[in-house]
Amino acid sequence: MATPSGTATATTYLARDHARAQAGTEVDAMPVLPASRWPAPPEGVAAEDVVWAETVAGGNYTHKVLARGTELRLTDLTGDACAHLLLHCADRPWERLNVADTVKVLWNAYLGEGHLLLSDQGRVLASVTWDTSGRHDALTGTSSLARNTVRYGDGTPQSASPAGRELFKLAALKHGLTPRDLPPSVSFFQGVRIAEDGTTEFTGSAGPGGTVTLRAEQDVTVLLANVPHPLDPRPAYTCGNLGVLAYRARPTSPGDPLWEATPEGRRAFLNTADHLTARGIA
């Protein structure tokens, strides 16, 4: 988008006219409104069932409240995206993603298809129903202001190298949440592995086009920050566009293979169903 000259915005009226002239401008990274205008819904998904369609540039964030049963598809469009994710129960944000329980209860530190994202109440917030990347992280969290300041010279949200936690703070504010409401996060598309000696090894990206699909098992507030992984060794602040698409579907139910995949997962689904049934939701 061209930068306006001083004369183009010299008065309030000129500034208004200039702003209105940009109304039809589209850029690579922006939300699609309404989301049903998204040109390529997933196979079998009607356009009117698409509820969120957005491309998030590197160094930016987004957020949305999604209904139970909604599927959220994240796509690494360039091979350099890194989607840091937080989930809160939409109507009671004190119940939120607990990464420690997500790893511990399920006996698996590596996120992928079939993994459940658990709250501190032992309930399922979301399930991973599809994964073509295999490069994710539930161990190291997102970047901090201090770390980015040392690495890139700045980590504030308005800088060229914003930290993930600083962007999470802004996303949280949009939902009445404070920094105290931000637990450790998980991230997708830039992986880590734990070596035999206990050190954390950065495995990076699987390349452009990788996708992960999450299914909301309760009404959730989704916070996303698309920033470089804190262990990314590249000296420059490198992060590509992230595709975000959500559409109406159905929550996991008894008889679904995911429900019965593990004893721990089954218990988490039963905890979730018990809670929702008592509230008249399920």
Task: Name the predicted role of every residue range.
Residues 2-282:
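Intrinsically disordered, low-complexity segments enriched in small/polar residues
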